[in-house]
Amino acid sequence: MADQAKLLFYNKMMDRTAIKHLIRRLISHFGITFTANILDQIKTLGFHQATNASISLGIDDLLTAPLKSWLIQDAEKQGYSSEQHHRYGSVHSVEKLRQLIETWYATSEYLKQEMNPNFRMTDPLNPVHMMSFSGARGSISQVHQLVGMRGLMSDPQGQIIDLPIQNNFREGLSLTEYIISCYGARKGVVDTAVRTSDAGYLTRRLVEVVQHIVVRKKDCGTLRGILLNSNRDGRRSIQPFSQQRLIGRVLADNLYVNMRCIATRNQDISNELARRLVISQVRQIYIRSPLTCKSMFCICQLCYGWNLTYNHLVELGEAVGIIAGQSIGEPGTQLTLRTFHTGGVFTGDIAEHIRTPFNGIIKFDEDLVYATRTRHGHPAWLCQDNLPVSIESKEKIHNFIVPAQSLLLVQNNQYVGSKQVIGQIRTTKSPLKERVKKPIYSNLDGELHWDTTVRHLSEHIHNNIHRVVKSGHIWILSGKLHNLSKTSLFFYQNQDKIHVQSPSITNYKSLPNSSEKDTKRDLDFIDSNIAKKESQTSNFGFSFSKITPNPSDSTNILSNIELKRNRRKNRVILLLGRVKSRYRKKSYSSFVLDIPNNGILNQGDILAISESPQYQTEISGIIKYGTIKVDSVGKREYIGDNEKTTTFRSRYKILKGGNFFLIPEEVYTIYQPSSHIFVSNNSIIEPGTQITFNITSRGGGLVQIKKVRKIFEIRILPGNIYYPKRLHKISKQTDILIPPGQKIFDEFKSDNWIYLQWITPYRKKTFLPVRPVLEYIISNHSFIEISSTFTYSRYRDIIQVQAAEYIFYEDGEEVRIRNNTSSIQLVQTCLVVNWKEPSIVRVAYVSPIEIRFNNILKTFLQISLIEFSNAYVEKGNSRASLKRLFSNQPFYSNNANNHLLSQFPINHPGVVRRLSDQGTDRSFVVLLPSDSYQSFYSPCHDGRNRRKQFVESRYKISFCEKEISERSNTLFLSFNRKKFLKLKEKLTNSFSSFDHHCMMQTTERLGLLGTVHSIAHYSLYSHRIINKNFFLSKDLDIDNSRAISQNSNWYILDENRVICGFDLIDSTQEDLSNRPHYLSVPCDVIIPFVNLGQFICEGVSLYEHETSYQSGQIIAIYQESVMIRLSKPYLATKGATVHSNYGDILKEGDTLITLIYERLRSGDIIQGLPKVEQLLEARSINSVSLDLEKNFLFWNNTMIRLVGNFWSHFLGVKTSIEQCQLFLVNKVQKVYRSQGVQISDKHIEIIVRQMTSKVITLEDGMANVFSPGELIELSRAQRMNRALKESISHKPIVLGMTKASLNTTSFISEASFQETTRVLARAALQGRIDWLKGLKENVVPGSVVPTGTGSREVICQIDIEKRKELGLLKTKNNKIFIRKIRDIFFYHEKVSISKNPKYIHMRLKKPVLKEINI
């Protein structure tokens, strides 16, 4: 019994924490037995008082906080605002989810904090309040779910569900909330998705790896230990230097405070000593650890420390290994079973907010901050250094300093209210995070478009992966994709043109079902010379009326040109006849059509190409021009290498035939160091010589090596080497081509062309390689008869096609054969389109068409022309494949007076686009909305300049010319935004008066559907005005009524995925200014520039009082309205990945982009258990630690003592493995402590010790002892190195739990864990012996396990320790003791040996033999 003065006295309310502290002090003062008696009395007292109070729990006792409705309403308002910003494209889905999670988490936490004050004010004696807050039953989180709100839950994969449970159990859950709640709790069939088996399997592996660890010694005698440093990790989640981590450990060295020793070596740390150390703020404590214990297959008392159950040193024979495994695995099981986990799962650290003390104007230096985004996607300003900020009001000024790396949420000189959040202070230690990829899926069907900087990844050159290098929007243009099976009756091919007049279609039906077998497929052939065409009604499912085409708009089918389709290569072959000879029949030359995807051909464009095999080469070399003459200016164009990559290449037109040469050589680019190159410069090699490890020369010759930065370029020059003495007509240092028959050296003439190249090595004689040359000859006249090809064409007096030959390389340019190319074409014959009257700008629409005539299917070429006299035509010939969506449904349209128009079918020209879908039996047919071409033509040549001078002189408005293409300029008005001019009269009147002298007329033509003027590419030329020419009136009204002479129809694909037609002027031809919704803007207001093709987001103001209610692209601008094609913007931040090409068609649900963001490593235990398993299985971690700077400083200070040390490499390895062990211990602790689970460090250290106890032998070790790559115990390797003359080289390795369990000294333990057949077969072949030292290998055969405080070997060990301490162990009794103990211990190291020299000499002869036999 303790003294009366030391008795404990408490006079306060006792909660759970106070009860714990009381029990701990009672055990330390009175012991376990007396403490149990006291606690039994306290229990009886508690039951007595509870019985007298009659406390019971009813549903009426669950009181909901009155602030809940207001808090939820405010959170819903913030969620709606976040959803609205996401719809605008201001934030992406990750930022929206992040803000939603933090909003509801803050709401839930605030509601939890308001519970206790609410109970205290309304009902202090509420049973729920008394039981939960006293710790008797239930926790605050559980009560919060009863009377507060359930909060956010996570799914089985650990992802947070973005729909919070707003109700509590008192109010009742809805069906949706109940299903979501089943994920977080254990109810229903959803429980099968919760991975409860993972925690059990984790426990089994942990126990398996440490089941043989038993306390068998009192002191191993080690001088090593681990260092506990209070500054190692300052995060709030884990405190490495705390009182709880010190209790029960043993000091490895004396401990001094202010030069005074307060604790000695091998002293255990009690509660009082731990409290003194924490109060004294000792920074470093050197303690003993299982990681540094010298015992090989066991552990000693002092390295393990206290048994925390009894608060004294662990007893000998204690199976601490199994205790450690269960201590780590069981909390995971309990957490998975939701014993500790309740309610909300969000565990993020919210940054500290800066609030204003009063109303005022905030001021700071704008030069010290820069714009950025918050983690919620909101605009903010980041300050690099400490930022002085002042808030000024009428009466006072408040100055303060914002710490560095903090965010300001307001702008300079902005008015702020009292208690308003104006900034966020960055936490000193950010929690450890990991990079996670979040896929974003498309919400609608349509076409992909982006307006940000997106680059194709070099490592993904053969697929469609792109990387966003600058934050911007990814757009999906709405549309509908129609599928047609290959068996459907659809006779149009890709790029075929459907050309009919507007009044011609009287009846339009959908295509028939392909299952109708009686469908006739006869179609009359339309000859190209018939001016008035008439098609008969057929059974295709739709009918045509009489067609009377306009001569300038009709299509001409060239029936005398034969085309063939190559289905396999997806090519169209054009066959042209050669010139007939007297003895030979007419032969044909094949050309491959090279028509752009839009079908537009301009002056000088290439119609078809032909590649002759005689101008192909399969070897690399250098091109040298001979007698040919080539145009000096090359034509640069896009060449599609395949479906996924596009490159540039240049053509040079051959003006005059002759010859050119290819000088062969082999070229290799080496990215390896020079030590990997096996040949030397200016050496001569034979064919098949090894150049590097993986490169072998195909030919022989002179080797030339050139280094450019870190890249080596190796050239092998074939030919012969000559050392000339006398030259004939050849100047030195000049490379030259020598024709056949010319004498070069004494008695040397070549029968073929050769190339001489002078080479002067350093300090060596000049020599001359004579290199062979390949000659190519090009004739001076074209062998293709072009004139008769278009004889029957109505355009023969307008268009002409000429054959021209082009070469792809300049003089001296290198031809390089890549690994993936078999040959390269040097010369190409092309058919070029030219106009006979160059002054008239024309555009030709060319496309192949297949026509069935008497069951014979033939392919012909159709051509249509549109000409513009002195026009300014906006055009493009991009070969990029465009995909637009079109519907064949009828539409309804409303005019400005809201009059409903009659049902009107689609009746305008279009081009059918068929997109092949590889691997399926379907193909996609895409109809595209028509484009509008606009031409401005005038009878006078200088009308445009006169108009420009007239307006500039009268209204002082400047004009600017912007180059749109090589042959067209467009006129633009530009105003000074700062000083907006007030126009006194309408510009349109001035233009009208001016038009008496120089008329300007607007004409429209519907172009081919799917050309480069399609919707997506308007943004590339956003400064163009295509659909209409607008003029400004004095009231700044958009007045175009005077410039329109006829009723024009517009047909556009709208957001409802149907074709909409709009009349620009109704049938009464009334002036548009009289419409009721006419937009009028005052003179002092600046009209924003709205361009065709411009993308706008929802909520953007187009004019002063006009706001867009949908996100989309402007596809038409009218007198009083703007038409927008429905689009969906997706915000893509820097580093995001786009998974499709520009212009690709996506379906709803397809993966659009992948965002990369950071999240906390451990949240819910569902996420934490896999991380524990990842660490204990020694798997690689993808993310890099954020504390690189701190780790570098630590390593820098640690490694200074190793510099210059002879054993520095050994010490470095030792330090590395020690740091690795501590890293694993701390990481596992972080996962559990983030969930509030306390696990002693010694348990994890025992596991980590077994993971790092193996080493792997290297190749330079002794092969007769261990095989290279064999796993052995570290202690065994050290003993072998001491016994053998030649040491064994080995390196440390970290094994996972499973791998360590399968590499032990007991094959019985291994076979009972995994791979039983393999382990037993391998052990039998190796002749292994199991010494049955552990627990599991004794359980299998039914033997007594060698553990327990009362076991035979433990009693003998205790007897040995006592006799050693008393000095009673004599030499004569050594033999008896050794004989008795040998039956128990199987390793001689366990036996304590006296200092008798004779006995030591005798015993040292046996250990090596025993170890080898093992």
Curated annotation (Swiss-Prot):
Principal place of residence: plastid
Keywords: Chloroplast, DNA-directed RNA polymerase, Metal-binding, Nucleotidyltransferase, Plastid, Transcription, Transferase, Zinc
Domain of life: Eukaryota
Cellular compartment(s): Plastid, Chloroplast
Record's keyword annotation contains Transcription: yes
Cofactor: Zn(2+)
Binding site residues for Zn(2+): C220, C293, C300, C303
Cofactor binding description: Binds 1 Zn(2+) ion per subunit.
Reactions catalysed according to its record: RNA(n) + a ribonucleoside 5'-triphosphate = RNA(n+1) + diphosphate
Pfam families: RNA_pol_Rpb1_4, RNA_pol_Rpb1_5
Top-level class of the enzyme under EC nomenclature: transferase
Any Gene Ontology biological process: DNA-templated transcription
Alphabetized GO MF terms: DNA binding; DNA-directed RNA polymerase activity; zinc ion binding
UniProt cross-references to InterPro entries, sorted A to Z: DNA-dir_RpoC2_beta_pp, RNA_pol_beta''_euk, RNA_pol_Rpb1_3_sf, RNA_pol_Rpb1_4, RNA_pol_Rpb1_5, Rpb1_funnel_sf
GO CC terms in record: chloroplast; DNA-directed RNA polymerase complex; mitochondrion
EC number: 2.7.7.6
Function: DNA-dependent RNA polymerase catalyzes the transcription of DNA into RNA using the four ribonucleoside triphosphates as substrates.
Subunit structure: In plastids the minimal PEP RNA polymerase catalytic core is composed of four subunits: alpha, beta, beta', and beta''. When a (nuclear-encoded) sigma factor is associated with the core the holoenzyme is formed, which can initiate transcription.
PANTHER family according to UniProt: DNA-DIRECTED RNA POLYMERASE SUBUNIT BETA
Protein name: DNA-directed RNA polymerase subunit beta''
Source organism of the structure: Angiopteris evecta
Gene: rpoC2
